[in-house]
């Protein structure tokens, strides 16, 4: 399969290359006691989740889409000794794992094969992995005393399943996102390593903003809030996970690099059900959106444009029209067709919670959607959308659908 230029130029143009992350060891570490802390609503039947995820992957590959899997890409990355050292220098530190275990942990880790290293980097290293055949008795005793019998030396990252959020490609470059919740902050380090060292990406990636070595404080950004829709326009949700501190820094960089001309900020209610803009609003075609009116109608839109006469070079203005109307006008569309979440108020709330509005476009008018959202899918089909259905019973337990589970790396323009 030929390699396409890196860059995402729309929400619905033909998808060429995408990164996903199959459920694995990290999900086997989920328990009823820790799943809430790790941002999952329940534990998964991991084997079924893997089968369902592989079905999702095969359906994309059947449409000539190149699908990269994160465990595989990370394993290929850490075969480079420089890459492994770069990661371990940042993962196995006095502050993260503690001085007493550092040397033995690193020695053990460096002795693993590349796929095992990738599995543990994503899946975490648990107290149960600190065994007498690998570690001294004193280290084992100390780890159990400090972490308990089911604790972690470094924690699992089950939310890598949702590759959308950690990094996002905006036209010709990518952001390495400082995540909102501590449970997700280590994900960015692994994605950054892939882009920095993997043979596919090394020396070819333009980083717009973000650095896993820096503390960004309140400046948090997640890819579920970021939409590079085309025509120099970027939509960015500002709710639970992405902050104005990050959004305005991103705007400065994109304008300075001439990568964007306007940012439309969607100020949203800060709720778990609307954690990202893409949980309530997604594109299905060039002129068709799928949205949850109950939340989208509450969005307060702002526009950010470059203006050197303004403080920090940014002209920020509140829009007087609705978010959807502002997006329609910005794209120069005579009409932006809308499909609302299906059913009465009870059904719509249920389907939105189950990611009915988190569809993922493979090309104009073709989207991936969970099978359980029958009412919304029926309305999308009536609007002329082809539905590529995937099973949701296990994959959806982390609150994310097709858009959440994908990080497009190469996508055509749509306008």
UniProtKB/Swiss-Prot annotation:
Task: Please give the pathway this protein is involved in.
Answer: Amino-acid degradation; L-arginine degradation via ADI pathway; carbamoyl phosphate from L-arginine: step 1/2
Main localization category: cytoplasm
Active site residues of this protein: 404 (amidino-cysteine intermediate)
Q: Which reaction does it catalyse?
A: L-arginine + H2O = L-citrulline + NH4(+)
Q: Give the EC class as a word.
A: hydrolase
Q: Which UniProt keywords are present, listed alphabetically?
A: Arginine metabolism, Cytoplasm, Hydrolase
Q: What GO CC annotations are associated with the protein?
A: cytoplasm
Q: What domain of life is recorded for the organism?
A: Bacteria
EC number annotated for this UniProt entry: 3.5.3.6
Q: Where in the cell is it found?
A: Cytoplasm
InterPro entries per UniProt? Arg_deiminase
A single GO BP term for this record reads: arginine catabolic process to ornithine
Is rRNA-binding among this UniProt entry's keywords?
no
Q: Which Gene3D superfamilies match?
A: Arginine deiminase, L-arginine/glycine Amidinotransferase, Chain A
MF terms per GO, please?
Answer: arginine deiminase activity
The similarity annotation says: Belongs to the arginine deiminase family.
HAMAP family in UniProt: Arg_deiminase
Q: What's the protein name?
A: Arginine deiminase
- Organism of origin is Dichelobacter nodosus (strain VCS1703A)
